[in-house]
Amino acid sequence: MSSSYFIATRASKFLSYVLRHRPDSIGVTLDAQGWADVSELLTKAAAAGMALTLDELKQVVAENDKKRFVLNDDATRIRAAQGHSVDVDLQLPVKAPPPVLYHGTVGKSMADIRKQGLTPMNRHDVHLSPDRETATRVATRRGKPVILVIETYPLLRDGYQFRVSDNGVWLVPEVPAKYIKFPG
């Protein structure tokens, strides 16, 4: 692996931490929709030991395989696409999901999921993937993946609303266990 890969990975993790969970850790302010001023972010990131140029920031945003970050059109503001634990309203419109979505998890979480369903944990929403491959990639980070199938029509019928983030992750407040198809 090249040193630029490790720098990009480190920068991505830093940005995730700051833009999703702890903007206060470096003194950055997020607006109500989760946007941070790029100039302020770059200045305060450098003071915290994560010096990035605007071009490097744009590269991290463009090349992040999960498209975790979004820059506005003139690259003056940035936000995380989803996954916030801080209070933000991404103002994503309600949208009809595909008939089936997927959630990647690991075996050690299954007992709790069977009892409680999928809950947002420390986030605002449950994250669902549009395909099995993405769900597998998400789960593999934490161990041997277990893929759960969510048929969305029953959730829609019962009043659940879905939103889709800028990077294609489907968001829903919760998925009770009765809506989950568990593997054999």
Swiss-Prot record:
EC number per UniProt: 2.7.1.-
UniProt entry tagged with the keyword Transferase: yes
**Do you know which SUPFAM superfamilies this protein is assigned to?**
ADP-ribosylation
Q: Which PANTHER family match?
A: PUTATIVE PHOSPHOTRANSFERASE, TRNA 2'-PHOSPHOTRANSFERASE 1
Give the family from UniProt. Answer: Belongs to the KptA/TPT1 family.
Purpose: Removes the 2'-phosphate from RNA via an intermediate in which the phosphate is ADP-ribosylated by NAD followed by a presumed transesterification to release the RNA and generate ADP-ribose 1''-2''-cyclic phosphate (APPR>P). May function as an ADP-ribosylase.
What is the protein named? Answer: Probable RNA 2'-phosphotransferase
Source organism (scientific name): Burkholderia pseudomallei (strain K96243)
The top of its lineage is: Bacteria, Pseudomonadati, Pseudomonadota, Betaproteobacteria, Burkholderiales
